[in-house]
Amino acid sequence: MPPKKQAQAGGSKKAEQKKKEKIIEDKTFGLKNKKGAKQQKFIKAVTHQVKFGQQNPRQVAQSEAEKKLKKDDKKKELQELNELFKPVVAAQKISKGADPKSVVCAFFKQGQCTKGDKCKFSHDLTLERKCEKRSVYIDARDEELEKDTMDNWDEKKLEEVVNKKHGEAEKKKPKTQIVCRHFLEAIENNKYGWFWVCPGGGDNCMYRHALPPGFVLKKDKKKEEKEDEISLEDLIERERSALGPNVTKITLESFLAWKKRKRQEKIDKLEQDMERRKADFKAGKALVISGREVFEFRPELVNDDDEEADDTRYIQGTGGDEVDDSVGVNDIDLSLYVPRDVEETGITVASLERFSTYASDKDENKLSEASGGLAENGERSDLDEDSGGGGQENGSIDAVPVDENLFTGEDLDELEEELNTLDLEE
């Protein structure tokens, strides 16, 4: 007799599965109904450990994915076999009194019906979808309303929805012209729809749920403002044309006089601020002052600090290993900082006619202006001026007339003295 087969050590698969479930139930006793994250995490870890042992979670997920792929491959293989060999289709049976034309032919589905128009069953494959039973628990209109969102609406559609949704409720409310802010926020944020409910009380909200005539949404206002913005070039041209012809030409003398005046104004302002802060400090009003201001307001503190300071002196020693790096020092040449007049040869100046004829926005005109050529607004190039002879003499350019008596001899002397005594620290 052949030897008996040895019994499996672990028993059948069902027995092993029952053992694992029993172990999981014992270890997680009283924790299944707990909703805490820690308890659920512990239950998941215990289940994974009992079922798969010490396997890596990635390996487990990979094995499950492989099983799923095998099932899909089997289904595809079965479908291919059915298409190739076309298994025998059982004869159709219908209940008494039923119309055969309301049932799709099973042989026609498999492509095996040879009766054609004589077949008593229907050959319309869309018949099943048309005759599908409607569930008494589902309203098809709800699905249509869910798909009909505010993103696809225009103004007319929005008014129609508002009237249908809030029309009857608006009639029962007390008369008020104030629009509900929740309603406006929902429309502005594209949250309004068929299922929107007012947080201020639903249909019992006392404010209006309708847009007043002519109301413009904020998002539409932003679009209009962006369209009304002008370019930087147009803004510069408008501001330049608004100056007019009666302006002072900027020369070296006028610029230096303006600079001197501004510097003096700055010094006067600083002195006034210092006097005011000093008065506040003496009166005890200044709460926040710097250490420098304290010694400026009370110079006697400097001597007190010197008397109380330590008499220890520190001498900086030089080690023998240190190398004396001789660095060349150059004196400052003040002549390099003397302002000089800019050479005006080759500089194009716009004529006074530009204020009467506004420059066109054509690209060709802008290109000619940038290159210094002929333009419609009255600008002239150096070649035209040289050929005409009337616009430029000896490198000087005709522009706005300058008052020669603007600076007297005394002003020029003061200016020269200031340049000679120029302090570089300023």
UniProtKB/Swiss-Prot annotation:
Record-level Gene Ontology MF annotations: zinc ion binding
Family statement: Belongs to the ZC3H15/TMA46 family.
A biological process from GO: cytokine-mediated signaling pathway
The encoding gene: Zc3h15
Location(s) in or outside the cell: Cytoplasm; Nucleus
Zinc finger (C3H1-type): 99-126, 174-212
A Pfam family of this chain: DFRP_C
Protein name per Swiss-Prot or TrEMBL: Zinc finger CCCH domain-containing protein 15
InterPro entries in alphabetical order: ZC3H15/TMA46_C, Znf_CCCH, Znf_CCCH_sf
Ranges where the record places region Disordered: 1-30, 53-74, 302-326, 359-426
Residues covered by region (Required for interaction with DRG1): 236-260
Tissue and organ distribution: Ubiquitously expressed.
Organism listed in the record: Rattus norvegicus (Rat)
SUPFAM superfamilies: CCCH zinc finger
Function: Protects DRG1 from proteolytic degradation. Stimulates DRG1 GTPase activity likely by increasing the affinity for the potassium ions.
Comp. bias intervals (Basic and acidic residues): 13-29, 64-74
